[in-house]
């Protein structure tokens, strides 16, 4: 008799996705981040659910309710810090996952890639709204500054911002709606992740060589289930080390001061995972120009399949492109550093150069390098 996992309508789906799925035999640890992102999402939904049981989305009590969670709720402190630092781990995994896609040419699976970009946008929006909820100084001013960027949109800008705020400033209405959206978004992300997986399984996974692996497939279980478990253990180890030894390492001290609309912090900056985009935004002196550059810095990922001029899919055998890729990584690290610095002399010009370099690398240098490599193959 056929095994129930192959016949049962529900188990059949799980079986085809996680057990009998034919996978390439040579995918490296860079392919672990998909499953790690799934684990991060589940962890964030669970810790977030327990936080929501004790949190109040009201300007007068939000800050106090977070303090109450940390001081009075059983293990509230660990739930709160797992949720806050879980977001950091989530973004580390996201950046690695996207970087892997860029390096190995996984963006040629256009449907999977485009849904991935939408997932990235949705996750960034969710993280931003979550950062507003503790209602500290950086929460309030971060919300004010970032939502205000929409006022740069011609004609409808001001109306749009006031519509999002639910008033003439960031206030109770804003906090309440941000909490509502922050709660619902992870479930939308989970649904999109399933669609992401659905499209991936139409084609099967890419592999480091970028060459079809149809001739050499192995079952997902036990090979990649055990590999994913190892990845998960390392992720949890990293997360719990952060949570238990230095939970506030990646946070901003200003967020331990309750929100005060009358007092602006000296340096308004977002969480570390948005600093690269924030640096690009700040490097353009024009408001609308900055906002466009900010959006394009992420949206540019959608153009990747169109910018692919190489005859080879992966960068594994393309040394010039490899070199440019790692320069791009260094450039993003530079932008992240600049985003956290005050707007002063050396930092302004470094930020502007790094921003120009970012777009130049993706739009010009990498496609040109690919064309050069194509011609070198003829020799």
Curated annotation (Swiss-Prot):
One GO CC term on file: respiratory chain complex III
Keywords: Electron transport, Heme, Iron, Membrane, Metal-binding, Mitochondrion, Mitochondrion inner membrane, Respiratory chain, Transmembrane, Transmembrane helix, Transport, Ubiquinone
Domain of life: Eukaryota
Transmembrane intervals: 33-53, 77-98, 113-133, 178-198, 226-246, 288-308, 320-340, 347-367
UniProt membrane topology term: Multi-pass membrane protein
Keyword Transmembrane helix carried by entry: yes
Principal location class: mitochondrion
InterPro entries given in the database record: Cyt_b/b6_C (IPR005798), Cyt_b/b6_C_sf (IPR036150), Cyt_b/b6_N (IPR005797), Cytb/b6-like_sf (IPR027387), Cytochrome_b (IPR030689), Cytochrome_b_C_euk/bac (IPR048260), Cytochrome_b_N_euk/bac (IPR048259), Di-haem_cyt_TM (IPR016174)
Gene3D superfamilies to which the protein is assigned, alphabetical: Cytochrome Bc1 Complex, Chain C
SUPFAM superfamilies linked to this entry: a domain/subunit of cytochrome bc1 complex (Ubiquinol-cytochrome c reductase), Transmembrane di-heme cytochromes
Cofactor: heme b
Annotated GO biological process: mitochondrial electron transport, ubiquinol to cytochrome c
Cofactor-binding details, from the entry: Binds 2 heme b groups non-covalently.
Pfam families for the chain: Cytochrom_B_C, Cytochrome_B
Compartment(s) where it occurs, according to its Swiss-Prot or TrEMBL record: Mitochondrion inner membrane
GO molecular function: metal ion binding; ubiquinol-cytochrome-c reductase activity
Positions with a binding annotation for heme b b566: 97, 196
Residues that bind a ubiquinone: 201
Subunit architecture: The cytochrome bc1 complex contains 11 subunits: 3 respiratory subunits (MT-CYB, CYC1 and UQCRFS1), 2 core proteins (UQCRC1 and UQCRC2) and 6 low-molecular weight proteins (UQCRH/QCR6, UQCRB/QCR7, UQCRQ/QCR8, UQCR10/QCR9, UQCR11/QCR10 and a cleavage product of UQCRFS1). This cytochrome bc1 complex then forms a dimer.
Similarity comment: family membership: Belongs to the cytochrome b family.
Annotated function: Component of the ubiquinol-cytochrome c reductase complex (complex III or cytochrome b-c1 complex) that is part of the mitochondrial respiratory chain. The b-c1 complex mediates electron transfer from ubiquinol to cytochrome c. Contributes to the generation of a proton gradient across the mitochondrial membrane that is then used for ATP synthesis.
Note in the entry: Heme 1 (or BL or b562) is low-potential and absorbs at about 562 nm, and heme 2 (or BH or b566) is high-potential and absorbs at about 566 nm.
Protein name per its UniProtKB record: Cytochrome b
């Amino acid at each position: 008799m056929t095994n129930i996992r192959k016949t049962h309508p529900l188990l059949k789906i799980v079986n085809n996705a996680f057990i009998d799925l034919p996978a390439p035999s040579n995918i490296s640890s860079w392919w672990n981040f998909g499953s790690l992102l799934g684990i991060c999402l589940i962890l964030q939904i669970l810790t977030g659910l327990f936080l929501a049981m004790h949190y109040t989305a009201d300007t007068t009590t939000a800050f106090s309710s977070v303090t109450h969670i940390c001081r009075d709720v059983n293990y509230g402190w660990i739930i709160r810090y797992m949720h806050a630092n879980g977001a950091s781990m989530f973004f580390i995994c996201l950046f690695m996952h996207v970087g892997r896609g860029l390096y190995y040419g996984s963006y040629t699976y256009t449907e999977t890639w485009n849904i991935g970009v939408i997932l990235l946008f949705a996750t960034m929006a969710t993280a931003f709204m979550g950062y507003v909820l503790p209602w500290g100084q950086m929460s309030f001013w971060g919300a004010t500054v970032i939502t205000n960027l929409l006022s740069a949109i011609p004609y409808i800008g001001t109306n749009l911002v006031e519509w999002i705020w639910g008033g003439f400033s960031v206030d109770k209405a804003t906090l309440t709606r941000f909490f509502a959206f922050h709660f619902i978004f992870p479930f939308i992300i989970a649904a999109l992740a399933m669609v992401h997986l659905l499209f991936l399984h139409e084609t099967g996974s890419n592999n480091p060589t970028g060459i079809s692996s149809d001739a050499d497939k192995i079952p997902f279980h036990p090979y990649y289930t055990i590999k994913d478990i190892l990845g998960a253990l390392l992720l949890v180890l990293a997360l719990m080390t952060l949570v238990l030894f230095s939970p506030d390492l990646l946070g901003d001290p200003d967020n331990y001061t309750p929100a005060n609309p009358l007092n602006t912090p000296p340096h308004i900056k977002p969480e570390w995972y948005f600093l690269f985009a924030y640096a690009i935004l700040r490097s353009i002196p024009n408001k609308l120009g900055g906002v466009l550059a900010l959006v394009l810095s992420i949206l540019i990922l959608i153009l990747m399949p169109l910018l692919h001029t190489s005859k080879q899919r992966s960068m594994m055998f393309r040394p010039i492109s490899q070199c440019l890729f790692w320069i791009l990584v260094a450039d993003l690290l530079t932008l992240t550093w600049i985003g956290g610095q005050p707007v002063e002399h050396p930092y302004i010009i470094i930020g502007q150069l790094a921003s120009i370099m970012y777009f130049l690398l993706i739009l010009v240098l990498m496609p040109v390098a690919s064309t050069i490599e194509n011609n070198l193959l003829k020799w």
